[in-house]
């Protein structure tokens, strides 16, 4: 990428102050800096899995992006192979959707299907989809900071397999983090994603070379004209999709509300009539039998 900087004299990551225009919650930013910083990616993987860095022998991003060719429609989840025997699919979901449950299952299945026709099933790798979000994606779910979902038997709750699952990191619920979540640095990472000013980010990155490296890359991309054009294009696309979604919901409510109100009115009348008839039956000694 041709670097066309829009910097003032002496302006660097170390001296940056104020609002970060494109943060780690930009999925294009997130994908790019994670594929560039093995140290940061290792730290995030360890936090999500609850393992130590010494357990990471090899980590390989299967779908790196090229900012020279990135488009607003590009899928921005990170698919990686850990220690050559496990697939991790990490995605940011920062816009509302009614279809995340179906989509997450589809993405998980696609990631799990890593063998060709005629290959041995033993070559399949353990696969987990990790969703990092600030949205309410599962209706009626109890608030939880880090939720883990597996296939289980409904009767005895025995786990079908631990090699196929979905984990959700809910950025809005850091106050519900467990001691294990804190020890595994999940709250630290959640705060990195939520950092919207350079002061907040640098305070978190202090004495952590891998995160300082990420901060430097975020700074550079925020002041690279070509990168900013891509990031802004993607943001507008996401916002447009979110607006169309919200508009569709509002329009549907407007269209259906008269029908809903009419049904409620009819239901109330039926309930009143039923109560009146029950009172008459009781008054005249008529039994239900």
Which positions does each model-derived feature cover?
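Short intrinsically disordered coil segments
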Residues: 144-150, 182-189, 233-235
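Non-catalytic, well-ordered alpha-helical scaffold segments
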Residues: 27, 39-42, 124-127, 166, ...
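Accessory alpha/beta interaction modules
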Residues: 1-165, 175-177
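Extended serine/threonine-enriched, polar tracts that run as long, contiguous segments within proteins
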Residues: 158, 163-187, 193
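Generic amphipathic alpha-helical segments used as scaffolds and interaction surfaces in large
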Residues: 32, 176, 180, 201-205
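Short, charged alpha-helical interaction segments and adjacent helix-coil junctions
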Residues: 2-18, 88-93, 187, 191-289
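Generic structural signal for hydrophobic core residues of well-folded globular domains
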Residues: 33, 48, 172, 192-193, ...
């Amino acid at each position: 990428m041709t670097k066309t900087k829009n910097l003032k004299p002496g302006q660097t990551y170390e001296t940056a102050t104020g609002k970060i225009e494109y943060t780690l919650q930009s999925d294009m930013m997130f994908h790019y800096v994670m594929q560039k910083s093995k140290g940061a990616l290792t730290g995030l993987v360890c936090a999500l899995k609850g393992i130590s860095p010494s357990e990471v022998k090899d980590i390989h991003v299967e779908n790196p992006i090229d900012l020279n060719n990135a488009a607003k429609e590009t899928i921005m989840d990170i698919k990686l192979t850990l220690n050559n025997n496990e697939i991790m699919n990490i995605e940011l979901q920062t816009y509302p959707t009614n279809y995340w449950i179906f989509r997450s299952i589809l993405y998980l299945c696609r990631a799990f299907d890593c063998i060709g026709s005629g290959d041995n099933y033993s070559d399949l790798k353990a696969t987990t989809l990790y969703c990092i979000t600030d949205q309410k994606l599962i209706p009626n779910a109890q608030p939880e900071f880090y939720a883990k979902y597996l296939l289980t038997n409904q009767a005895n709750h025995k786990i079908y397999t631990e090699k196929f699952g979905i984990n959700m990191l809910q950025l809005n619920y850091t106050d519900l983090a467990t001691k294990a979540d804190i020890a595994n640095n999940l709250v630290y990472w959640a705060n990195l994603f939520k950092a919207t000013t350079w002061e907040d980010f640098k305070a978190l990155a202090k004495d952590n070379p891998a995160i300082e490296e990420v901060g430097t890359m975020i700074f550079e991309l925020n002041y690279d004209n070509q990168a900013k054009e891509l990031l802004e294009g993607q943001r507008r696309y996401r916002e447009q999709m979110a607006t169309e979604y919200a508009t569709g919901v509002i329009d549907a409510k407007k269209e259906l509300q008269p029908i809903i109100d009419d049904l409620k009115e009819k239901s109330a009348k039926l309930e009143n009539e039923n109560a009146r008839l029950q009172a008459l039956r009781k008054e005249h000694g008529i039994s239900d039998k």
